[in-house]
Structure formats: C-alpha cells, structure tokens
UniProtKB/Swiss-Prot annotation:
The record marks R161 as: Part of the EHPQR-motif. It holds the Pfam family FliG_M. This is Flagellar motor switch protein FliG. Disulfide bonds: none annotated. It comes from the Bacteria. Keywords: Bacterial flagellum, Cell inner membrane, Cell membrane, Chemotaxis, Flagellar rotation, Membrane. It comes from Thermotoga maritima (strain ATCC 43589 / DSM 3109 / JCM 10099 / NBRC 100826 / MSB8).
C-alpha cells in the first residue's frame, strides 16, 4: 500500500503528540513562538491519528522508532500541558488565549476583506452598538483606522460601547451578520467568542493617532469619567516603558522616587530592568541593584501602586509634550 501523503505541519504535530508532554516540551523550547503557536493549533485540531499514520511518521523520524505510547487524540488540554511544561503556566495561558481565536471561525470575516473606506461609508449609517460589535471582531489596528475615520460625534459613543461590551449573545451577532450580509457579502456564522470590553477599547485607542485619541478621550471624560480613567489605565502598562526611547526614560527617571522605582522594578522583566539601568549613571544603577537585592519579599499591591505612580508620571509628561509614547495609527482615511 502506498504511503499516504501527510502535510508537513500535521507530521510535526503527530510527532509531538507521540513524544508525550515532557519530550514535546523540550522540543518546543527550541522553536520560536510563532512556530509553537502554529503547531499547537495543529495539535488541538489533530483529531484521531490512525496507527498507520503514526507508523509512517515515526519511520520518517528514525530516532523515535521505539516510541511506546499510542498517539492520543490531542486537543486543547494536551496542548496546554505541553505549553505549561515548555514555558510555565503564565506564558502558556497567554499563548492559549491567543490561539483560541485561531481555533474558531470568527464572525464578520467578510468585513476583513472589505475596503476600509467602503466599510466606513457603510458603518457610519449603522447604529453605534452595531458598529461597536463589528469593530470588536476586527484586529485593533484596523478597528482604530475605521474608528478614526468615523464622524467625530460617533467616535466616542462607539468606543464607549466597545468598552462596555462583554459577552454578545450568538443570536444578536447572527442577526447583525444577517443584516450586513444583505448589504455587503454572504457569510455563514458557526462559532462565537468573548468580544469587546475595556481591554479591546484600550487596544484600539493605542492604535489611534495621538490627535484622534485625545479628542475621543476628552469627550469621554466629560460623558463617563470613570470609564475614561479605566480605559486610560489599560492603554499603557508598566512593561510598555520598553517602548520609550532612552531620552524619554531619562526624563521620567528624574521625577521618580528611588524607593518607588525599586518597588516597581521588583515585578518587572529582566529586559525592562536592564533598560532602566542603562539609562542611569553607573553609581545610581549600582545603588538601585543593591536595593533590589536586599529588599526581600514585598506585597504585590505595593508593587502595583509603585508602578502606577510611574505610569502617572509618564502620562503627565506625555500630556505636556515632553515625551512621546510610540503608538499605532497609520495614514488617516480621507472621506
């Protein structure tokens, strides 16, 4: 019987499942994150692997000829175990969250193939809630481009509705899709996922140009100051300091209390710590390293409060035009 032709990515997935979580994790440690994500999608969708397919793959990889266990069906739980062993629970959780969308068919796929200018012309006549649902399913840079091109009186209302979205019922999404289908394109919906929320609104705002972002936020502050503050808090997190240039970091450090800086860095990545040390004098960096070393255990609440103080300083300096935070926002759409 001639060998069945197996897709390369599926072969890799079959091999990893055959290896078991421990050894598969060791292999994954040597792969880049994009490849890991592609393989996990394949593993999660692998279905039942026949003994013939397993034999064919293992014979191709001679070093695995003595594999002892039957291949399991795979699935997201298996993928999660492998990732946890390879990268630890936290990073595994983040990868799985990103992959969830890859394992589902997203609604509004026809919208992603529509010219942005045409989409703006169409959406601006829709109800703000409809626009909010549609934008929540788009990638943040695309959603930001469309939001920025909507009439000003719509922008704040739509962002507010995106931020307040949590779970949209499948019936509502289906109804919106049916209506859009008649006007734009045919689409058959199959599955739905969590959409919208403050994080989505913040991501979209991060991808807007500074002028549009400020106009929307100023208006939102007047209409719903609590929501505006919550969105603003999510728009810049402590690790985003990595996006600042050296001059901006130095300006920030001049205004930060040393104790607050040490506390804030207690919960920071090594990459961020190194960037901070690099922008200090050798003596100041040495003193800060000593303080970090001898600080001992600290409460997470204290670390977060210290980080928030520094974020507030960064926001104030940006508002004053003294520093610039790298943001998205491509060319504006001219209507």
């Amino acid at each position: 019987m001639p060998e069945k032709k197996i897709d390369g990515r599926r072969k890799a997935a079959v091999l990893l499942v055959a290896l078991g979580p421990e050894k598969a994790a060791q292999v994954m440690k040597h792969l880049d994150e994009e490849t890991v994500e592609q393989l996990v999608v394949e593993i999660a969708n692998i279905g039942r692997v026949t003994p013939e397919e397993k034999k064919q793959v293992l014979e191709e990889f001679l070093s695995l000829a003595k594999a002892k266990e039957m291949i399991s069906e795979g699935g997201i739980e298996y993928a999660k175990k492998v990732l946890e062993k390879a990268f630890g629970p936290e990073r595994a959780r983040k990868i799985i969250e990103r992959l969830t969308s890859s394992l589902q068919v997203k609604p509004f796929s026809f919208v992603r193939d529509t010219d942005p200018v045409q989409l703006v012309n169409f959406l601006q006549s829709e109800h703000p809630q409809t626009i909010a649902v549609v934008l929540s399913y788009l990638d943040p840079p695309v959603a930001a481009q469309i939001l920025g091109a909507l009439p000003e009186e719509l922008q704040t209302e739509v962002l507010k509705r995106i931020a307040l979205l949590e779970r949209t019922s499948p019936e509502v999404v289906k109804e919106i899709e049916r209506n859009l289908e008649k006007k734009i394109s045919g689409f058959v919906s199959r599955t739905f996922s969590k959409v919208g929320g403050i994080d989505t609104a913040a991501e979209i705002m991060n991808n807007l140009d500074r002028t549009t972002e400020k106009k929307i936020m100023d208006k939102l502050v007047q209409e719903n100051p609590e929501l505006a503050d919550e969105i603003r808090r999510r728009m810049f997190v402590f690790e985003d300091i990595l996006k600042l240039d050296d001059r901006s970091i130095q300006l920030v450090l001049r205004e930060v209390d040393t104790r607050d800086l040490a506390l804030a860095l207690k919960g920071a990545s090594d990459e961020l710590k190194e960037k901070i040390f690099k922008n200090m004098s050798k003596r100041a960096a040495a003193l800060l390293k000593d303080e970090l070393e001898y600080m001992g255990p600290v409460r997470l609440k204290d670390v977060e409060e210290a980080q928030q103080k520094i974020i507030n300083i960064i926001r104030r300096l940006e508002e004053a035009g003294e520093i610039v935070i790298a943001r998205g926002g491509g060319e504006e759409l001219i209507m």
